[in-house]
C-alpha cells in the first residue's frame, strides 16, 4: 500500500462570499465544504492529512478537528500564493511519503474515483499528475498546454496567447506529486510575476523542464467545481442533491419529484421507501423500508420505522424514534419521543418528551404539556391506550396500558391501566333557552 499525504488548502478569505464565515465553512447538505473534501480524501485511502489555514483559522481548525482525527494543521501567515500555502506544510512534506495529493478546500464535489485515478498514475510511474477537464466555455480557467502527448505547462488565461485561449482542456486545480520530488519541486517555484506570488501551477513547467514524467488525468467538470460566491454555493449544493437523489433512486427509493426534495449529507433511506414532493431531510435522519414520506414534511434527527406513514405537513424533530407502521399525520409535530408499533397520531398534535407504547391512538388536537418554564418533563403512555381528541396531557404523567382518556380532558394525574379518565367540567344543558337568549341579545342590540 502506497503511503499518501493530502494537503488541503483552506487559507482563503473568500471575499466574494460577502460573509464573515470562512469560505470553506459554508455548507452544502448540512456539511462544511472542507468536510466534503476531507471525506472523499479519506475514501481515497489517504494515510496522512494536512490542512493549511489562514483566514478564520480558529474556526476552521475547530471544524476540521471535530470532523477528523489526527489532522496536521499549518497556518499560512502571509497570502503569497498557492505554492506558498503548500509549503506552509513543509514539516509534513519532510516526513516523506509515496504520494502527495494537493486539493482545495472549496471543491466539495470531488469524488474519490477522481483522486484514485491521480494516485494510480503515480503508482504507474508519473511524477506530476494534474486533474484536467474539458470546458464548453474555458473563459477564466488555466489552459493545459501539451506537446507530443505530454503536459508541459499550465498557462493562466491572463498570460495566454490568442491561440492558447482557444484550448478547451483546462486545469482542474487538483495535483498529485511523487513524494520523492514534491518538496524540491515546490521550493523551485518563484514569484516572478505581476502579483509577486508563488503559483502552484508553475510546478508543471518546472517538472517538465527537468525531464520528469508529467501527466494529466481528465475528470468530470462537476468534480472540480469551486465555490467562490453564494450563487456557486447554490449550484454546488444543487449538483450534490442531484447526485444523492440519483443514488437513492438507483438503490430502490421512489422519489416522485426529486428536484423538490432536500437531503443532508448523512441521510439514510432504505430501498422501498416512497418520498412525495417538497420534503426536507435535516441532519441525522434514517428511514426504513416501506415507509412513505408524504408531501411537505420536515424531518431532522429522526428514525422512521418500517412501513411508517409521515405527513403530509408533518414535522419530526431530533430524538424522534418511530417503530414500524406508525402514522404521523398532517400538521403534527413530534420531538424527542419514542412511539411504539402501529400507533397513530393523525391530526394536529404536538408530542414531546414522550414514550408511547404500541397500538396507541392519539386523537386530533392532543398536546403534551411537557415544559414548566424551567424544565422538560416526560410522559409515558402504555400499549393500546386511547387518547380522545383535544386532550392536554400535563407532564410528568403516566397513562397505563389500555386506558381511555375522554375527549377535551386536561389530565394532570397518573391514570392506572384499563381506566377511564375525564378532566373537564360537566356539561350543563338548558332546554329551550336558546330562543330566550336570542331575544335578549336582539333587544340589547336595538337599544344601541
UniProtKB/Swiss-Prot annotation:
Cofactors (names): Mg(2+)
GO annotation (BP), single: cell wall organization
Transport as UniProt keyword: no
Major subcellular site: cytoplasm
Gene Ontology cellular component terms for the protein in this record: cytoplasm; membrane
Region: Linker, residue numbers: 231-251
Positions contributing to acetyl-CoA binding: 364, 370-371, 389, 407, 424
Keyword Nucleotide-binding found: no
List of catalytic residues: 347
EC number assigned by the record: 2.7.7.23, 2.3.1.157
InterPro entries, sorted: Bifunctional_GlmU, GlmU-like, GlmU_C_LbH, Hexapep, Hexapep_transf_CS, MobA-like_NTP_Trfase, Nucleotide-diphossugar_trans, Trimer_LpxA-like_sf
Function: Catalyzes the last two sequential reactions in the de novo biosynthetic pathway for UDP-N-acetylglucosamine (UDP-GlcNAc). The C-terminal domain catalyzes the transfer of acetyl group from acetyl coenzyme A to glucosamine-1-phosphate (GlcN-1-P) to produce N-acetylglucosamine-1-phosphate (GlcNAc-1-P), which is converted into UDP-GlcNAc by the transfer of uridine 5-monophosphate (from uridine 5-triphosphate), a reaction catalyzed by the N-terminal domain.
Quaternary structure, from the entry: Homotrimer.
Listed name of the protein: Bifunctional protein GlmU
Organism in which the protein naturally occurs: Bartonella henselae (strain ATCC 49882 / DSM 28221 / CCUG 30454 / Houston 1)
Phylogenetic classification of the source organism: Bacteria, Pseudomonadati, Pseudomonadota, Alphaproteobacteria, Hyphomicrobiales
